[in-house]
Amino acid sequence: MPTTVSEEIAGYQLTLETGELAKQANGAVKVQYGNTVVLVTATASKEPKDDLNFFPLTVDYEERLYAVGKIPGGFIKREGKPTEKATLTARLTDRPIRPLFPDGFRNPVHIVSTVLSVDQNCPPEIASIIGASAALSISDIPFDGPIASVKVGKVNDEIVVTPDVDEHEESQLDLVVAGTKDAIMMVEAEANELPEDEMLEAIMKAHEEIKKIITMQEQLVEQVGQKKMEVELDLPSDELVSEVEELALEDIEKVLQIKDKLEREDAMDEAKQKVVDHLLEKYNSEENEDEEEELKEKHIKSAFDSILKREMRSRIIHENSRPDGRGQKEIRPVTCDVDLLPNTHGSGLFTRGQTQVLNVCTLGALGDVQILDGLDIEESKRYMHHYNFPPYSVGEAGFMKGPGRREIGHGALAERALKPMIPTEKDFPYTIRLVSEVLESNGSTSMGSVCASSLSLMDAGVPIEKAVSGIAMGLIKEGDQLAILSDIQGIEDFLGDMDFKVAGTEDGITALQMDIKISGTTREILKQALKQGKDGYLHILNIMKQTISEPREELSPLAPRVIKKQIDPDKIRNVIGPGGKMINKIIDETGVKIDIEPDGLIYISSSDAEQAEQAIKAIDELIKEPEVGEVYLGKVVRTEKYGAFVEILPGKEGLVHISELAEDRVGKTEDVAKVGDEILVKIINIDERGRINLSRKQALGEEDGKTNNDDKKSTKKT
């Protein structure tokens, strides 16, 4: 018998149901929001993975195209690898729940969100987050939830929770917030230059709705919640931590005074290994088993890291001393460069401390858009950003492979940051691809990608509205004391309480991503972080403007030129031709790319201006309307007893009656006009059905012999 709880949230009915589907999972909840239905399951292994030093959580978001009544495109008619949207939603589900598992929990946990039905007004990614929390909360898996999530927009200066499709199109904000009853855990936002106070207001409004959904989950737990399993947490003992502290504290204090990342990491590894060797030798002398020694080594390293974290945080809070010697608001040295690569359309290099990103911009025809075969209404996108993070960027030897979840996520964040500034298709009819190559990494390569992308776009001559920059912020909180750090580096990100990335222009925020690992993050803390973040990215923006302050007036000479031509929508079929015959002929003969919009707007893309002009002339011929009295050099395509059919324009034929072939009487059509001959003809009549009547004898009587298709060359004098 299923158990359900239901409540109206932002105008749509939200129902959580368990007990009917997927009953062998540790926890399973069917979430229905409006007509969106997502089944979320949570399973956990009974035994821990002893060889791991991290929590093995896997989140999979499974899109099913039947959810929107579609059959997958392509040769194989089933879903393949996850789409980019599915990967991003899996990350969105993972991020707010991961901090709520116990430290030292090493049992593999698997969350699977399967999308069964999609109502475009009620986003399935929100149902996935709610379902993951609910499934974990009612299961026997240790979890310090529940959490919930909502999507928020801003339409006509009003904050709207769960905006519908039409409102989403008009919204100045696309915000996803997740949190517990007491605190915000995650924020993901794209905005059209939203002020910080309005962003904060939207986050707080979202939290009010989140509390209602958490109450629903608590009701479900009261009815069907299981007793949590007893697990042994894989943590070093207090005695071991004390022993490691005694051996390592002095070295850790020295390590934290080293400003260079690589030098500091080498010293840290050396100090850690010294403690490991000392303690393993001690335990070896006590004749411990090998397996216990390996386990102990992991615990020794964990104890060392906990002391390192404590000492670094203490130095920041009490001494205002960061690992590289900067103040809390101080940003590392920034340098910028553009036009680095000779054969690309645009390039930008952004370096901030030991983080360096090269971005390359490529422009293409509208036909180069990325086709999307997913659950959203959007079927293609003309602006995309790809992010690559090779092992050498952190000084490691590794394997080069396809983009992982992290790379897809970082690329999407940088893409969102610049999206509000990208010109519309009408104003700039190009496909835009940006690729960020991370060359060095020591904190916030995603925000480095935003800055490098902005430089690259302006170098390519893309008329972006304004330049965009970004910065990563951090938070260290100990009791009532806190430090908000600008431009965090890798070690501060790893050991801090908040990862907070913000991008924007001089006039407001364009993207925001926040992950908070602790409770008690107040409105005032978020307000201070947003203000300090804006100060930081504006500082970087001013440095970028010293290199290039606005888009170049001309596109790169290597970029294709796009010419727009408006025609009557009723003439589109003339340009395309039967089975695409006419348009493909133009493309084959001129080498251009042609894209046609339903409203009759044609885009001709070519790197060769002469070829583009040839294509335009060919299109003009296809859409030209013949008029009575005009003379053409036509081609005989068919002969009958009563006359000859002559093509005067591509796809347009007329009849020369046998009596109109010559002044003298003609006994047989072929005596004057054979198939393939080119002859002069004049339009003498177009009847009410559009049929064209031609005359050869009247055309021959024209004095100047000028035709309306002079560019055609005759193969036979007539």
Swiss-Prot record:
Q: Which residues bind Mg(2+)?
A: D493, D499
Give the reaction(s) catalysed.
RNA(n+1) + phosphate = RNA(n) + a ribonucleoside 5'-diphosphate
- Among the Pfam families in the record, one is RNase_PH_C
Q: Where is the KH domain?
A: 560-619
Q: What is its EC number?
A: 2.7.7.8
Cofactor(s) annotated in UniProt: Mg(2+)
In the UniProt record, does the keyword Metal-binding occur?
A: yes
Q: Which GO terms describe its molecular function?
A: 3'-5'-RNA exonuclease activity; magnesium ion binding; polyribonucleotide nucleotidyltransferase activity; RNA binding
Q: Which gene codes for it?
A: pnp
> PROSITE patterns from the xrefs?
KH_TYPE_1, S1
Q: What is this protein called?
A: Polyribonucleotide nucleotidyltransferase
The biological process GO terms on file are: mRNA catabolic process; RNA processing
Q: Which residues form the S1 motif domain?
A: 629-697
Q: Where in the cell is it found?
A: Cytoplasm
Free-text function comment from the UniProt entry = Involved in mRNA degradation. Catalyzes the phosphorolysis of single-stranded polyribonucleotides processively in the 3'- to 5'-direction.
